[in-house]
């Protein structure tokens, strides 16, 4: 996890960008040009990470929801790792699992510092690979979890998720497949949305405040929609790295959320509107370093934004390379 260190660099003036994105128009004017669609993009995510890693590199991926019809994953990712001094290539590796495990790990860090210690039920909205790695991370830091609720779009992915839980998660005693968001969210201690986001904010998965259990942690590596009054006035807003959202706000000027599709950009939209103050958005690093309190009561609802940083990919990719070399 990035914990406020100068020993890292990412693309952009603030050294905290998610990366450089290629997207396509809604109405292409040239033959053969792709058309805008849900999660259709290319992304380059370069970074340098110091400390014990001393590694430069880049994750590159293409994403298209239509891949599923061809039996391919939505995103297909590669990672290049380079010597930080010479630039010589050290490894070119598939990065699908690297990316999924690093994405799952960050909600796990959030649960470690923000979830109630007596959490027993977790909800996964989107039973794909990212939902699985998030669940594994939650189980590693919340040993009292015994029930997982899951909502998905198709029976095939739901069945695969159930089989995964039976095989890999022995502490889970019950898997509940839910037909609605309300059923999935109610009575859960941890709610995690990992589903593919639609293009328009109005179509993002909706979570009503009165469905959310007091004291719940809502982890959002993907998009969700809430009532403004709840987000502004009745939840703690935590982000994985505030500067990441500042960089997004520069790249995608207000309103940013519909384009970025990570809830931290909704927070910066509120900041732009003057509806919240900067101090209302808390960096997880400040909680880890004890500069800011984490959970302040058993009834506090916390919304945790997970944007994803290239330095995390370099850290985990570099670790995998180290184990391979050994």
Label each PLM-derived region with a short phrase:
Residues 14-78, 84-90:
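N-terminal entrance/gating region of PLP-dependent enzymes' catalytic architecture
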Residues 199-214:
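Rossmann-fold NAD(P) dinucleotide-binding segment
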